Amino acid sequence: MKRRIWAMAAAAVLGVSLLSGCGEGGPDAPPAAEVEEDGASGGNYDLSQVEERIYVLGHSGSAGSTNDFWGLTFAELVEEKSGGKMTVEVYNASQLGSDTSIAADVQANSVDFQITSPAAIPNVVKESAVFDMPFLFDTVEEAREAVMDDAVFDGLTDAFEAQGLKLFPLTDQGFRCITTNKEITGADSFRGMSLRTMNNPYQIAWFTAMGVAATPLNTSEIYLALQQGMLDGQENPWSQVYDKGLYDVQKYVTNSNHVLYVGCMFMGTGNWNELSSVERQIIWDAAQECVPIVQEYTDSYENEMLQKLINEYGMIYVDFDQIPGLREQLREETFDVAYESITGAIGNELLDQLLTVAGYGDMIPQ
């Protein structure tokens, strides 16, 4: 079916009409210890156990971004399922603070929900570094299958809970991709390149292994640094390249697909534990239903942004798939450094599980 919130978000960005639907996806419902599964059957909830309450959700995405669409979709689903008794107010564009500060407020139970990327909060739940392993996937479908693996999600759930956070089913904003002012023709093109990265120690480590002069900068600082010639390139989802106007200061856009930009939503365990079993089930079900809806929106939105970058703003598309062996070479150059830096921080169990699911079990050090 077509959801009202989808049309609202699309109109806010591009006026693009996107189809969405609810389907199976993500981990199973929470264990009975947290949610009484008979408290909700086929979407029929005992609303006598639901209190009227306003919840607060914060994120750093701009209006119309994937995270904003995700938050608004979640809010609509919660309202529908609760018969209007549970209202989620969504605050976008860092109105509640930075990703790190919002996460701290969620841990303190002063903000109810946050939507962000684990890569943006590496010091909050260190195990989320598992998704910083580069060049594992050729397609977004492969990446999503690995990320949604039950054992991977269970390990992350335990890690988030240890930090006072209840993790909900994961989704994503597509791949992060590199843009540059010089054409990429092979792995040697990266030697000596000054490239903006996230302020993420694991990604900085493996970008450095590629020969890149990794330069961590906040998103708001990228345009000026490129304009002044301080950087040769940067990496972000295509939508961020468009949203920040980087087409003015970058010539080439690629499908490097070096990491999936995983998205996560979580709640403080203090607030979670105060909810009734029905309220918890409503929230979990809404979060799980968001997964396929957000993925479909992401795919449409990111592809639309790429076409705009190429056709309207004249960026030149460099297809990594047409450069023989490029991703494989970059994977080999970065694997050991990435593996050692990540497992040095979080141990090897969770990363080994992801690598096995992704088809790289034979590359795991023995």
Give the ranges of each region predicted by the language model.
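Bacterial N-terminal signal peptides that target proteins for export
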Residues: 1-9
